[in-house]
Amino acid sequence: MMMANVINNPPTPFVHNMGPIHPGKMIFINGIPGANPSRFNINFEDTPDGPNTAFTCDFRFNFGYDRNVIVRNSMQNNNWGAEERAVSYFPMAPNAYFEMIILVEQLGFKVAVNNNHLLEYKHILLPLDKFTFLRIDGDVRITQVRFQ
């Protein structure tokens, strides 16, 4: 059963049954990365600890060899696909408030941060409606999540 449309100050990790994703669905995520963050990620999964992830968006501030990188990927049956890393800028900073919008479209996801288009990620795993869980994990304090 789908829960509330607005969730304020949820704990991290945050796992929520948002109902099926579909073209036109928008997810608004506001938050603040930690003071010395390693990474945080946003995932659309088929179950709370899903073996299938339609989309992961992993903001890596200082993780392994990665510095200020955004990794996008999909996972099928616990196997990750090919990473996408190219973006024109890294919109996050430690302790800096952000507002993110993720729009589900027919062909893929579009992500904007602080009113600026950031990236697109084409759908790899279908059908979309089997992905009902949003997971946010890592070095971030979420102030609000909203679904529309």
Regions found by a protein language model. Give the residues of each.
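C-terminal helix/juxtamembrane-tail motif
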Residues: 1-14, 133-148
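Secretory/extracellular carbohydrate-interaction modules
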Residues: 2-73
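Surface-exposed coil/turn segments at beta-strand junctions on protein surfaces, enriched
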Residues: 22, 93-95, 127
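Carbohydrate-binding surfaces in secreted/extracellular proteins
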Residues: 29, 98-119
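Eukaryotic short linear interaction motifs
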Residues: 36-38, 49-52, 108-110, 118-121, ...
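Preference for well-ordered, secondary-structure-rich cores of eukaryotic proteins
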Residues: 48, 55-63, 67-68, 97, ...
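Short, aromatic/His-centered strand-loop micro-motif at the edge of beta-sheets
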Residues: 80-99
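Short, solvent-exposed beta-strand-to-loop segments that form ligand-recognition rims
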Residues: 116-131
